[in-house]
Amino acid sequence: MAKQKFERTKPHVNVGTIGHVDHGKTTLTAAITKVLALQGAAQFVSYDQIDNAPEERARGITIAIRHVEYQTARRHYAHVDCPGHADYIKNMITGAAQMDGAILVVSAPDGPMPQTREHVLLARQVQVPAMVVFLNKVDMMDDEELLELVELELRELLSNHGFPGDEVPIVRGSALAALSSASTDINAPEYKCILDLMNAVDEYIPTPVREIDKPFLMPIEDVFGIKGRGTVVTGRIERGKVKMGDTVEIIGMTHEAPRRTVVTGVEMFQKTLDEGIAGDNVGVLLRGIERTEVERGQVLAAPGSIKPHATFKANVYVLKKEEGGRHTPFFSGYRPQFYIRTTDVTGAIHLPEGVEMVMPGDNIEMTVELIVPVAIEEGLRFAIREGGRTVGAGVVSAIVD
């Protein structure tokens, strides 16, 4: 009999553990793989393997990050855990590992701590859509009233940061008890909290909308004039799909309103394509557009789906000297280049009131004013460059103008 083909039948969801140092993020990550491995739905990854996470580079920044994968009956998960607090900040801002949902780990005896708040705030600013809470180390608490107080405090913290605090599932348990248990019985009581948590993640974290189902958008990388045929723009489709006859807008890099045009052809590797979809590198032929009227850095998009803006708020991580960043602080009025999708645009930085300067290694919210509007939206990631090197990474948290 022929071998069965592996079918990816389950939806794929990206999750990650967040929370204060030593509250049990890595222990929980290891415990999830251990318990699901008993069901044959994961490979066990030990605490030490996660703790000694390999380094990756994203947008010019080095981040220590560990990826594990596992399955439930309903979904396939990729799960990220970062050993250091700074690595979390860098991962969330660069989007090195995108999260469709987060598991916030809080130690019951300690309650919410400064990094708990910081991670929740960041999760809000980088548009993590949903969160589930694992209240850890409950075996160290025998006072039910105190546990309820910690839960109340957590729900309030989540509500204050724009998450639906009253709805967020809070699962109580001990990650260490699950991880150190010798039992191979999936129904052992110490494993119940892990199964309950995965159930909550399955139920509460929504399946992400696939990029292909979103409105069309393609950042323009190059422009060619083809004699007798018109102008072709090339790039990688970021989301949605495009076909001949579609109306699209050319957006950004100008103070004029976006221009509308019609797609007269889509090509890939010199061959005609019926439809280009998210992830494809394509050439798009545009009707009635001169070679000089379109440039790299603009985007091609479904009409009305994205607008050009020049002023926005952003959450930014400023690289340390050791990471190849600046050696000195910068002040309000600093004018670096912002590398947004396919282009560098000069912009001025305005620091929040009461903040005199920004040091290398800081994580800060700032307002940015570009010299020309570009297509941006909340959640969009960018790099800050100066003299050809990356000095920071950011994510748009709000549009101002």
Swiss-Prot record:
Disulfide bonds: none annotated. Mg(2+) binds at T26. It catalyses: GTP + H2O = GDP + phosphate + H(+). Residues 60-64 are annotated as: G2. It is found in: Cytoplasm. Residues 10-209 form the tr-type G domain. Residues 19-26 are annotated as: G1. Its EC number is 3.6.5.3. PROSITE patterns: G_TR_1 (PS00301), G_TR_2 (PS51722). It comes from the Bacteria. GO terms for cellular component: cytosol. Keywords: Cytoplasm, Elongation factor, GTP-binding, Hydrolase, Magnesium, Metal-binding, Nucleotide-binding, Protein biosynthesis. Residues 136-139 are annotated as: G4. GO terms for molecular function: GTP binding; GTPase activity; translation elongation factor activity. InterPro entries: EF-Tu_GTP-bd, EF-Tu_GTPase, EFTu-like_2, EFTU_2, G_TR_CS, P-loop_NTPase, Small_GTP-bd, T_Tr_GTP-bd_dom. Residues 81-84 are annotated as: G3. Monomer. Belongs to the TRAFAC class translation factor GTPase superfamily. Classic translation factor GTPase family. EF-Tu/EF-1A subfamily. GTP hydrolase that promotes the GTP-dependent binding of aminoacyl-tRNA to the A-site of ribosomes during protein biosynthesis. This is Elongation factor Tu 2. It comes from Roseiflexus sp. (strain RS-1). The gene is tuf2.
